[in-house]
């Protein structure tokens, strides 16, 4: 099974990707995690990616397509995968299609801008594992085994940067949505909008019902 999760920053894609991964034993391919890992390397390419991320711009299509395509095609994903944060543009979507990997489900996570900013203000990351946490929407029990002082704010979670990313997302999502709605007409792909205002648990239940053909 091949699942794609798209949506703006802070809409819960990463959280649901991890939950679905545990439930269905599918590996997560997270563009954000991959790029942040590259950005920590003391290389010219690592510095380039770091500067792009910190500026709030999207990594150019030519670069991100190459990175994700290599990841998808050159590693062992025989049982499928969960693709978190790719594609973000129509060019990326077409390139994913050209890999001839049959995407089964596309979930678009939708959340009002005001709530996106509220969530991002309380979002932290474990710099070692790359796991993202939210102290407001996640239960304390999920964080009790962590030393909170080891968690850090993401460098790209500053207000001006998020504003830029949201503008880019709003510009691209219209075409991306049309692309997958059209694909749904001609292929077995199924496209669903997910209301991210619901709790983590309820969002997860909704997605699982769709995957298990109960909705």
Curated annotation (Swiss-Prot):
This is Adenylate kinase. Its EC number is 2.7.4.3. It catalyses: AMP + ATP = 2 ADP. GO terms for biological process: AMP salvage. Consists of three domains, a large central CORE domain and two small peripheral domains, NMPbind and LID, which undergo movements during catalysis. The LID domain closes over the site of phosphoryl transfer upon ATP binding. Assembling and dissambling the active center during each catalytic cycle provides an effective means to prevent ATP hydrolysis. It is found in: Cytoplasm. GO terms for molecular function: adenylate kinase activity; ATP binding. It holds the Pfam family ADK. The lineage of its organism: Bacteria, Pseudomonadati, Pseudomonadota, Gammaproteobacteria, Enterobacterales. Catalyzes the reversible transfer of the terminal phosphate group between ATP and AMP. Plays an important role in cellular energy homeostasis and in adenine nucleotide metabolism. Pathway: Purine metabolism; AMP biosynthesis via salvage pathway; AMP from ADP: step 1/1. GO terms for cellular component: cytoplasm. It comes from the Bacteria. It comes from Buchnera aphidicola subsp. Baizongia pistaciae (strain Bp). Belongs to the adenylate kinase family. Residues 122-157 are annotated as: LID. Keywords: ATP-binding, Cytoplasm, Kinase, Nucleotide biosynthesis, Nucleotide-binding, Transferase. Residues 30-59 are annotated as: NMP. Its main location: cytoplasm. AMP binds at residues 31, 36, 57-59, 85-88, 92, 154, 165. Monomer. ATP binds at residues 10-15, 123, 132-133, 198.
């Amino acid at each position: 099974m091949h699942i794609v999760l798209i949506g703006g920053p802070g809409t819960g894609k990463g959280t649901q990707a991890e939950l679905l991964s545990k439930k269905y034993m599918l590996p997560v391919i997270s563009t954000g995690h991959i790029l942040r890992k590259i950005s920590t390397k003391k290389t010219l390419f690592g510095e380039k990616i770091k500067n792009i991320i910190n500026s709030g711009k999207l990594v150019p299509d030519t670069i991100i397509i190459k990175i994700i395509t290599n990841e998808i095609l050159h590693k062992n994903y025989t049982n499928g995968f969960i693709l978190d944060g790719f594609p973000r543009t129509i060019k990326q979507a077409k390139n994913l299609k050209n890999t001839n990997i049959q995407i089964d489900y596309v979930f678009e996570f939708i959340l009002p801008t005001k709530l996106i900013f509220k969530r991002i203000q309380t979002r932290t990351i474990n710099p070692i594992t790359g796991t993202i946490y939210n102290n407001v929407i996640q239960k304390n029990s999920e964080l009790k085994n962590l030393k909170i002082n080891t968690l850090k704010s993401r460098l790209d979670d500053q207000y001006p940067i998020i504003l830029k990313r949201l503008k880019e997302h709003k510009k691209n999502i219209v075409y991306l949505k049309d692309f997958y709605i059209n694909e749904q007409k001609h292929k077995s792909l199924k496209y669903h909008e997910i209301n991210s205002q619901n709790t983590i648990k309820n969002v997860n239940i909704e997605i699982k019902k769709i995957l298990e053909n109960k909705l």
